[in-house]
Amino acid sequence: MHFHERFDVIVVGGGHAGTEAALAAARMGSKTLLLTHNIDTLGQMSCNPAIGGIGKGHLVKEIDALGGAMAIATDYAGIQFRTLNSSKGPAVRATRAQADRALYRQKIQNILQNQPNLRIFQQAVDDLIVENHQVVGVVTQMGLAFESPAVVLTTGTFLSGKIHIGLENYSGGRAGDPPAIALANRLRELPIRVGRLKTGTPPRIDANTIDFSQMTEQKGDSPLPVMSFMGDVSHHPKQISCWITHTNEKTHEIIRGGLDRSPMYSGVIEGIGPRYCPSIEDKIHRFADKSSHQIFIEPEGLNTNEIYPNGISTSLPFDVQLNLVRSIKGMENAEIMRPGYAIEYDYFDPRDLKNSLETKAINGLFFAGQINGTTGYEEAGAQGLLAGMNASLQVQGKEAWCPRRDEAYLGVLVDDLSTLGTKEPYRMFTSRAEYRLLLREDNADIRLTAKGRELGLVDDARWAAFSEKLESIELELQRLRGQWVHPNSPLIHALNPHLNTPISREASFEELLRRPEMDYSKLMQIEGFGPGLEDPQAAEQVQIQVKYSGYIQRQQEEINKAVRNENTGLPLTLDYKEVPGLSNEVIAKLNNHKPETIGQASRISGITPAAISILLVHLKKRGLLRKSA
């Protein structure tokens, strides 16, 4: 049975990747269908109730700069906001928000339901319709076929998902949801490499059974940060505290005593878990010398008693979970509301994707989120936006787009995945980026919003606000460069008390701001130098662009050298055995990876600069030298 309408883009799955993919395609004018097994769980935060953090906050800002929903929803749902690394340089500062699950889900659903060009339909997908290596639609559980030349799969942990608690296990996509078995079996028929990964979640605790007086209170920041460039503090709901406690030697003894019934340590789970978010049993085993581990006690919302104990993700049997929880200071009488568990699921080797997130094997089929081996809401949302955008571009007959590594953390993420692949759940860190001074949270809009506007992702309101901000920054920089103060100026009496060394020669306001003891807000408060910019985002940009101008210029020069051959395209049909001069090892690796560009090829382990030179000569001789989009 065929549905009565055709769609330009179909998105399968309504998590963080799926919602951003559907919204992106619809914003660009494509007639879009979002298929989900349950409309009520669209935008669900399946694991921790938080958005942002080191590297992750940068991705959220980039999603926002391209018109996405994640940051906006976080501003409306965030019950505690903090700026991490605030004492460090701007490149590694990151915003993190504790979020009310219900408010976040509610805001995402509201955005989806009010998005033009977007239809939502509740049905699980069991099959893909593929003809001559081209996707042409999907078939749902009840045999209903939907036709489309572009399909984005954002299946999360649902593909052959298996939930483990102790030595017991059962099929599930997450707690309370069925797995996608039929779709997983269908995908295994495709010429794409498949593997298994695992992730986990901690038990949820009843707040009424916790003694918070035994814990350290952790308040949010003041003044309050915002996540979206369009956000405002007035959007935030009531702000509340989190708390900190620790495991102890007794906790560790209980965990060690239960390892024989752990699915991870008894060989029941084969999938590899996230390195940077390990289970508590993994921490105790790997860091046996540590006598305690920190636990963040995080409320799940304003109108729920559920507490998320961040740091004790576990798949141990329930009796062991209860004992280990009650061994922790402040939780001696705690009651578990939901047990912790591990979930194992299928993922597909992202090296089989183009950097548009389209599969190399099937035209029009895109993957985004955990299906590509990543972990985290932010990583999923960023991929979803890119996949939905490129699906829409393809339907419109336009070239795909993906930012370079020097343009966005999204570019780093996709390049890492499509070039190097991953054997464990991949999460973003600032340390993964070579050019992180240019890839800051604060300038994500300056880097990406103009491109988003060109692609059709950015609406009029965001574009107007961005243009106004950009103009105010430029005018203020011109003012600082054009106004001067000299030793005999009447302004000097107000200025000198704020300087480590008094002014001895004429200096521009810009030079004064560059001094280490001076910052923008301080300079603007001195009589005769203000009033300056009212918009704190614009003021921050002025300060960073002035103070770091030398470093930024140097990094830009490095990038200009590096990108000379970065985008030189490599035909996916090229058989590297035909390239004379390449070693057998290099030939095998290049034929295995099928890189899209010289830049990607150069980042594959074992591909030498000499091999790259040989490739460039071969391409030139064959008339194949071309620049990738």
UniProtKB/Swiss-Prot annotation:
GO CC, alphabetical: cytosol
Location relative to the cell: Cytoplasm
UniProt KW keywords: Cytoplasm, FAD, Flavoprotein, NAD, tRNA processing
Cofactor(s) the protein requires to work: FAD
Residues bound to NAD(+): 273-287
UniProt entry tagged with the keyword NAD: yes
Sections of the chain in a coiled coil: none
Chief place where the protein resides: cytoplasm
InterPro entries with a match to the protein in the record: FAD/NAD-bd_sf, GIDA_C_N, MnmG, MnmG-rel, MnmG-rel_CS, MnmG_C, MnmG_C_subdom, MnmG_C_subdom_sf
GO biological process, one term: tRNA methylation
Pfam families: GIDA, GIDA_C_1st, SAM_GIDA_C
Gene Ontology terms for molecular function: flavin adenine dinucleotide binding
Positions contributing to FAD binding: G13, G14, G15, H16, A17, G18
Similarity comment: family membership: Belongs to the MnmG family.
Subunit text: Homodimer. Heterotetramer of two MnmE and two MnmG subunits.
Function summary: NAD-binding protein involved in the addition of a carboxymethylaminomethyl (cmnm) group at the wobble position (U34) of certain tRNAs, forming tRNA-cmnm(5)s(2)U34.
PANTHER family the record matches: GLUCOSE INHIBITED DIVISION PROTEIN A, PROTEIN MTO1 HOMOLOG, MITOCHONDRIAL
HAMAP family attached to this UniProt entry: MnmG_GidA (MF_00129)
Protein's UniProt name: tRNA uridine 5-carboxymethylaminomethyl modification enzyme MnmG
Organism: Shewanella baltica (strain OS155 / ATCC BAA-1091)
